[in-house]
Amino acid sequence: MNARVWYLLVILGTLVVAVCEAAQKPTGEDAPLPTIVGHRGLILDAPENTLASFRACLELGFGFELDVQRTKDGHLMCLHDTTIDRTTDRKGSLTELTRYQTVGLDAGSWFSPRFKNQRIPGIDQVFSLIAAYPKSAAIYAVDIKLNDAKVEADLVVLAKKHGILDRLLFIGNTIQDASVRQRLYAADRAVQMAAVAHNSKELVVSLANPLTTWVYVRYLPSPAEITKVHAQGKQIFIAGNTVAGHQSDNWAYCITHGVDAILTDYAMELGRQLRRSKQSK
């Protein structure tokens, strides 16, 4: 082997090591802070799944999670339940109402008189609002609540219309259906979606999914599991009863071990904890 070939092999080996090291996301004090994702918006300070709740998150630099349902005439709306009973001044199923009929619903007074006449927003309106904050690096998690074989393409079309497809992450139980994932991927290969894992056994299956770029865990994963997710080039999004409440110890664990995003009802409190963590570094 001549000197030139030897030199090239050394350089190549150095580059391989550098790439492998770069793929290992740091943990502990060097771990970047996770993104805050407000559950249905700033849920403790404004009515869930409304523009007021989402705007509050955007102003604070938080991401948010939103739910997707459809009206009788096919419009995509932001609503968690299948009925309007809990979060408006009327009763009934959303699928029995047209988009026009939803306009008069009061989706804010149930929470506080200050939010009287907040409406059930259309997904088009929500995406437009996100687009109005182009400098935000937050994550906007889309939880598809229906499975009608057309919703995935419709969502991608709206996201691309507003130029925010790369800022959305598709999550939830519906996305566990392989056909839903395939339709999202067919709509646009740049779609970011997460496979759900409720425990360590499911994490193995979720990591093996070739179409997903994130793992959506609903338990507190071990440091080794978090490292494994990152080693495979994916990111980890945590939700569920380990982080949804005001759970400072679990939040601190996620911060220390490099979880990428935390979905919580207590976005403001988590924000304060992240600021303290950043200041202490």
For each of these PLM feature ranges, what is it?
Residues 7-17:
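Bacterial N-terminal signal peptides
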Residues 36-38, 64-66, 140-142, 168-172, ...:
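Hydrophobic faces of well-ordered beta-strands that scaffold small-molecule active sites
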Residues 39, 57, 67, 102, ...:
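Conserved, mostly hydrophobic/aromatic
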Residues 53-70, 209-215:
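Catalytic domains of carbohydrate-active enzymes, especially glycoside hydrolases
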